Design a protein with these regions (language model features):
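Inter-helical turn/loop segments and adjacent helix faces that build the functional surface
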Residues: 9-28, 43-62, 79-86
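Generic structural signal for well-ordered, non-transmembrane alpha-helical segments
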Residues: 1, 27-38, 65-72
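Alpha-helical bundle segments that constitute or directly flank the non-heme di-iron/ferroxidase center
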Residues: 1-14, 38
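Charged/polar, low-hydrophobicity segments characteristic of intrinsically disordered regions
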Residues: 35-46, 76-78, 107
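Extended, helix-rich structural scaffolds rather than catalytic motifs
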Residues: 52-159
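Acidic/His metal-coordination segments adjacent to aromatic residues that form catalytic metal sites
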Residues: 1, 14-20, 70, 74
Length: 159
C-alpha cells in the first residue's frame, strides 16, 4: 500500500515527458517493491493453507484500513489537488483499489466496495513493471532495466 501513490506521481510526470531519468529509477524501485509483494503474498497464502487459523482476518483488515488511511492522508498532504492529473478523489480511489487487489492476492475478500478499477491505469505503461517493453528509450543512451539474466552464454565461470 505504501509508496505506490508516489510511484504514480513520477509516472504522471513521465507521461508528459518530464523527469524521464527519475521515472526510470522509480520504475526499478517499483519493480523491487513488487518483488517483495509477490514474495510475501506467496508466503502468506502458504501459511494460510498450512494453518488456516494462524492469522486473525479481523486484524489483517484493521491493518489494511490503517495503512490505507495513512497513505491517503500522506499523499493528500504532499500532493493533494496541486498536481494536474492527481486529485484527492483519485488518490482515495487508487489506494482503496490497491488494497482490494492486495487482499484478493492473499485469498481475502476486498475491503472497499466499489473500488474495483485503477484510476491510474493509463500510467501502467510507464511503470512497465511486467517488462512488457512499453517504455521506449534511445538505443544508444538506454540502459537495461530488466532483471532477466542471459542464459545463452556459458563458460563464464572459467574466467
Amino acid at each position: 500500500i505504501y509508496f505506490y501513490n508516489g510511484f504514480n506521481f513520477f509516472y504522471l510526470l513521465a507521461s508528459r515527458n518530464r523527469m524521464m531519468g527519475t521515472a526510470d529509477i522509480i520504475r526499478l524501485i517499483n519493480r523491487d517493491e513488487l518483488s517483495h509483494v509477490v514474495l510475501f503474498q506467496n508466503m502468506l497464502r502458504e501459511i494460510r493453507n498450512e494453518n488456516p487459523n494462524f492469522f486473525d482476518e479481523n486484524i489483517i483488515y484493521e491493518m489494511f484500513k490503517k495503512a490505507v488511511e495513512q497513505e491517503i492522508n500522506w499523499t493528500n498532504h504532499i500532493i493533494g489537488d496541486r498536481v494536474l492529473g492527481v486529485t484527492k478523489e483519485s488518490t482515495e480511489a487508487y489506494t482503496k483499489w490497491l488494497a482490494n487487489e492486495r487482499l484478493r492476492s492473499i485469498g481475502l475478500k476486498p475491503l472497499y466496495d466499489g473500488f474495483d478499477r485503477n484510476p491510474y491505469k493509463h500510467l501502467s505503461k510507464f511503470a512497465d513493471t511486467e517488462g512488457e517493453g512499453n517504455v521506449k528509450a534511445n538505443f544508444f543512451e538506454g540502459t537495461v532495466t530488466s532483471y532477466n539474466m542471459s542464459s545463452s552464454i556459458e563458460g563464464w565461470d572459467e574466467f
